[in-house]
Amino acid sequence: MKLVRKDIEKDNAGQVTLVPEEPEDMWHTYNLVQVGDSLRASTIRKVQTESSTGSVGSNRVRTTLTLCVEAIDFDSQACQLRVKGTNIQENEYVKMGAYHTIELEPNRQFTLAKKQWDSVVLERIEQACDPAWSADVAAVVMQEGLAHVCLVTPSMTLTRAKVEVNIPRKRKGNCSQHDRALERFYEQVVQAIQRHINFEVVKCILVASPGFVREQFCDYMFQQAVKTDNKVLLENRSKFLQVHASSGHKYSLKEVLCDPTVASRLSDTKAAGEVKALDDFYKMLQHEPDRAFYGLKQVERANEALAIDTLLISDELFRHQDVATRSRYVRLVDSVKENAGTVRIFSSLHVSGEQLGQLTGVAAILRFPVPELSDQEDDSSSEED
């Protein structure tokens, strides 16, 4: 993401002009735009024209509109963002108050104005415009007949390809059908890797599977690379890291990122940091339950006691339609930072973010036990009974 201009007043009202450069920038933009904001961008509008003879025709024109945002729609697989709202500035093609949907496009700038820019949104702009935040990890999670090729960016896990091939069982005295199907499966996975992984950007490609599938696949891939003189694969061989996974399903990616070998290799990535923080929370919940809580009320009480060491919070909560609720989460983040706590904002498009979402989207690891919080938890559960 490129920051073109930033005009924010002391009262935190103002506007920023940005240019999305990568597909992931659309995800960042989705987290920036909120209902009630005003968005100015170039768009296509179908307009009706009347000729001198009175015949009516229609054609599409490119124009710049400023909308008051009413609805936001994000397609995570295509990384497309559509913003619907009413026109609030005079335009020769569109009446004031008329509805329009802008589809934000890569490499076309837009200007976003807000009455209140909060700290979480401003921090996201800083991160989005930091060139170090790029998709530098890829993963192939596989089992016999099933593979997912994923890109792990700082903000999301993108499934770029799913490969499924029916592998017949080995039969006594006749393994040829099984072997042919397995070779066809491996070949399709190799093609998906070459199609979807940019070796100039990606620093590490994780190949994860149960059993010996990963070893057999990598042997096949590099034998074929030698045969066909595939320089790209051969030159990047050192980037491939083989690790264990319980299955070829996407959810196995979390356990892969928890693997100590992987964690040390990816120690500088945000995704690995999120996975470790969630893992630490679960361990604390198991061994010292007085120092691990989830749910907004419990976490707010822990914060009042200045007890929060690490706050885990889903970015989904900052997209809440209710301004008061959204502000409550922002205040919690600001307060934890002011009290020297660490804040981890999880992407809801990461596997770890999905898991945090199942724990209400907000959790905390405490510096010291707060037994009264456990008592309150017991009281509330007995009241429910």
From Swiss-Prot:
Q: Which SMART domains match?
A: eRF1_1
Molecular function (GO) terms for this protein are: metal ion binding; nucleoside-triphosphatase regulator activity; ribosome binding; stalled ribosome sensor activity
Does the entry feature the keyword Acetylation, yes or no? Answer: no
Entry-annotated residues carrying Phosphoserine: 374, 380-382
Keywords from the UniProt entry: Cell cycle, Cell division, Cytoplasm, Isopeptide bond, Metal-binding, Phosphoprotein, Translation regulation, Ubl conjugation
In the UniProt record, does the keyword GTP-binding occur? no
Q: Where is this cross-link: Glycyl lysine isopeptide (Lys-Gly) (interchain with G-Cter in SUMO2)?
A: 162
Q: Which residues form a coiled coil?
A: none
**What GO terms fall under cellular component here?**
cytoplasm; cytosolic ribosome; Dom34-Hbs1 complex
Which biological process annotations from GO are given for this protein? cell division; chromosome organization; endoderm development; inner cell mass cell proliferation; mesenchymal to epithelial transition; nonfunctional rRNA decay; nuclear-transcribed mRNA catabolic process, no-go decay; nuclear-transcribed mRNA catabolic process, non-stop decay
Q: Where in the cell is it found?
A: Cytoplasm
Task: Fetch the InterPro entries from UniProt.
Answer: eFR1_2_sf, eRF1_1_Pelota, eRF1_2, eRF1_3, Pelota/DOM34_N, Ribosomal_eL30-like_sf, Transl-rel_pelota
* Cofactor(s) it depends on: a divalent metal cation
Checking PANTHER family in the record gives: PELOTA, PROTEIN PELOTA HOMOLOG
Q: Which NCBIfam families match?
A: pelota
Q: How does it assemble?
A: Component of the Pelota-HBS1L complex, also named Dom34-Hbs1 complex, composed of PELO and HBS1L. Interacts with PINK1. Interacts with ABCE1. Interacts with CNOT4.
- Please report which protein family the annotation says this sequence is part of: Belongs to the eukaryotic release factor 1 family. Pelota subfamily.
Functional description taken from the UniProt entry: Component of the Pelota-HBS1L complex, a complex that recognizes stalled ribosomes and triggers the No-Go Decay (NGD) pathway. In the Pelota-HBS1L complex, PELO recognizes ribosomes stalled at the 3' end of an mRNA and engages stalled ribosomes by destabilizing mRNA in the mRNA channel. Following mRNA extraction from stalled ribosomes by the SKI complex, the Pelota-HBS1L complex promotes recruitment of ABCE1, which drives the disassembly of stalled ribosomes, followed by degradation of damaged mRNAs as part of the NGD pathway.
Please give the name of this protein: Protein pelota homolog
Species in which this protein is naturally found: Rattus norvegicus
Task: Give the taxonomic lineage as stored in the record.
Answer: Eukaryota, Metazoa, Chordata, Craniata, Vertebrata
